[in-house]
Amino acid sequence: MPASAADLCEFINASPSPFHVCATVAGRLLDAGYAELSEVERWPDHPGRYFIVRAGSLVAWSAGQGVKAHAPFRIVGAHTDSPNLRVKQHPDLLVAGWRVVALQPYGGAWLNSWLDRDLGVSGRLSVRSAGKGSEITDRLVRIDDPILRVPQLAIHLAEDRKSLTLDPQRHVNAVWGVGDKAGSLLEYVAERTGVAVADVLAVDLMTHDLVPSMVIGADANLLSAPRLDNQVSCYAGMEALLASVPHDCLPVLALFDHEEVGSTSDRGARSNLLSTVLERIVLAAGGGRDDYLRRLPASLLVSADMAHATHPNYPECHEPSHLIEVNAGPVLKVHPNLRYATDGRTAAAFEVACQQAGVRLQRYEHRADRPCGSTIGPLASARTGIPTVDVGAAQLAMHSARELMGAHDVAVYSAALQAFFSADLF
């Protein structure tokens, strides 16, 4: 098994929610000597390696000695969230003797893939701190026991056996027991998390697949896991930042929540998160707003998100002249109507980075007769004015509860992003 693929499996297994992704990345950054800063406090005026966390988003950077106040940024951006089934605020139901938890889809979840799976619960609780008046703290939740399951209708009862139509309001609720009254999921979660249910003020809870991530295939060259979209890019960007070496440019890792639902939030790619952090980096180094503004057009951002490999059962769904393979290198994504932010200049820059890393680069275009998804790329580029290129690793079954990629792509994806941080591009 490739070492990087095994490490990615551990990363994904430890990160069932966006909050856990940030906690996992933060832990590895701290182990590497990074220091966490607060957005509401003054930042150090000396070089160093730092990061901030805003709920389910994280930004990290490495400012070495001698980096000029107007030196450009090299940014790898990715997203921490994945499509899933999320717990409603009043989830407890009793239906025909079944204790039911009401769920609803988050993002473009491929609903059929969540049926008949053993599911855990993860996320966070906002709780009243003991002995601290009205202060609120967050507690991460991770229950890996198989407490929930969304059962499929038996084929004998289906009106149409040739197709499957799921109503997101009625057909994706989970059973978790039987009885003569509804259970209390909140009481269960609070007890498992070690807090008093009376101290729980609010919840952000979601479900996750319990089958561990694993390398599969006769030649052990495929990786099966939940949340490949987009924890693979979070992992690869983190590894690239940790391996980055001092350079004239300042490397930044930006991991955003809420990409799967449009990025319009206090911590999404449409927010002020990245632009505020970048400007504060300049100000803390003794520069001014003019120095910050001078940096932006000379900077470069990689929007790192997963890409569609050509599906062997549905090759007709892909652009015939742009067939994408797994274990064949990262994927450059281009769209003439700017569903991706790539242009000729940014594509050339990433090509140079891949050449310096000795990594093959594939090129993807979407079929013109099918709607195309998007990424944080166009949003972050418009918000900051930084030239942007959209890239990713190839995978199958995007937005399913469980996805598939090439095990050898993990290392080359990280290597390409590491080269991007240090290559002379502009």
Swiss-Prot record:
The lineage of its organism: Bacteria, Bacillati, Actinomycetota, Actinomycetes, Mycobacteriales. HAMAP family: Aminopeptidase_M18_2. It comes from the Bacteria. Keywords: Aminopeptidase, Hydrolase, Metal-binding, Metalloprotease, Protease, Zinc. It is an enzyme of class 3 (hydrolase). InterPro entries: M18_aminopeptidase_2, Peptidase_M18, Peptidase_M18_dom2. Belongs to the peptidase M18 family. Pfam families: Peptidase_M18. Disulfide bonds: none annotated. Its EC number is 3.4.11.-. Its cofactor is Zn(2+). GO terms for molecular function: aminopeptidase activity; metallopeptidase activity; zinc ion binding. Zn(2+) binds at H79, H156, H399. One of its GO terms (cellular component) is cytoplasm. This is Probable M18 family aminopeptidase 2. GO terms for biological process: proteolysis.
